[in-house]
């Protein structure tokens, strides 16, 4: 079983209340984009204004924090907004409480948006499919705690490790756009899945987009045919919704 030690540093979480969306479908245009976020050592930065990926940078790149041209970033299954610990923009995220991105929503008050105010252990180096590979290398990195799944490692009173001491397990504190539980490796349970949640993302300049991740393993053409590939993400978005 592959266990990943996770820790969380809280820097004052903004409350995430849910305004009630209007029940009628909107007439907005829904865009669909595929982002290659398979690399463990990079974040991929996307601009809603430009409708495309505009930068790819190493996970600890400091210069990207001063860049206000990006709005949302992807690292495997972790997400950032241009705000707080991740950037100097006016970004943030809000969980709408619906699963249909075509449903009209109400943009909440500014204080309902949560900036990137937490860090969590993220894998920055790992070799898939190599039984001799070293354990994953992790580092505490900033992320958005609404768009990303937040976890902690707790003692599992029902199991013991090889040394006879109590084993640990992953506790999911919040489900973001994509959920991953590495405890499920080698079991019949899914290791990763989609929450199917719709979010409002506030951009670096204070505008708003609606977003929903609809695939976290988009197929890639290989010698074996179309192969589902973890970290190949497809998301839908509507911009602007102001």
Question: Model-found features: residue ranges?
Answer:
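Bacterial N-terminal signal peptides that target proteins for export
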Residues: 1-3
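C-terminal motif of bacterial Sec signal peptides marking the signal peptidase cleavage site
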Residues: 11-15
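Surface-exposed, beta-sheet-biased, low-hydrophobicity segments with strongly acidic/polar composition
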Residues: 19-242
